[in-house]
């Protein structure tokens, strides 16, 4: 629980809400500007492919924020002398709760959160440093 609290504090301290909103607005504005142009580029931007591109930008940015908040949470645990292995354990439980299923490449790319198993592995590696 302490690791999750540290993770969530990380979102606040790292300004993720504002930067996520800014990225979403910029991606949307960019796609709409491209869609308003003539030719193949405009047609692609206005199509479902353009929507997919926008979703990809937003989800990858979100995954990056989740990773940096994981790092913040682990540093929080270390700083306060808490068991750093607890974060790995939490992500292993999350992976098990999802049936241990790994999504396909596209599912993983469009997810707002990194794969919990990969997050657990990363936390294990960082805790051992």
Predicted regions and their residues:
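A Zn2+-metalloprotease active-site environment signal
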Residues: 1-129
């Amino acid at each position: 629980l302490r690791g999750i609290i540290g993770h969530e504090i990380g979102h606040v301290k790292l300004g993720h809400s504002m930067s996520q909103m800014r990225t979403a607005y910029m991606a949307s504005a960019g796609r709409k500007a491209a869609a308003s142009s003539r030719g193949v580029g405009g047609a692609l931007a206005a199509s479902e492919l353009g929507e997919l591109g926008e979703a990809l930008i937003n989800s990858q940015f979100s995954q990056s924020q989740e990773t940096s908040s994981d790092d913040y949470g682990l540093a929080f645990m270390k700083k306060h002398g808490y068991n750093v292995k607890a974060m790995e354990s939490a992500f292993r439980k999350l992976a098990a709760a999802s049936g241990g299923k790994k999504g396909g490449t596209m599912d993983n790319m469009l997810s707002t959160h990194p794969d919990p198993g990969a997050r657990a592995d990363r936390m294990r590696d960082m805790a051992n440093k």
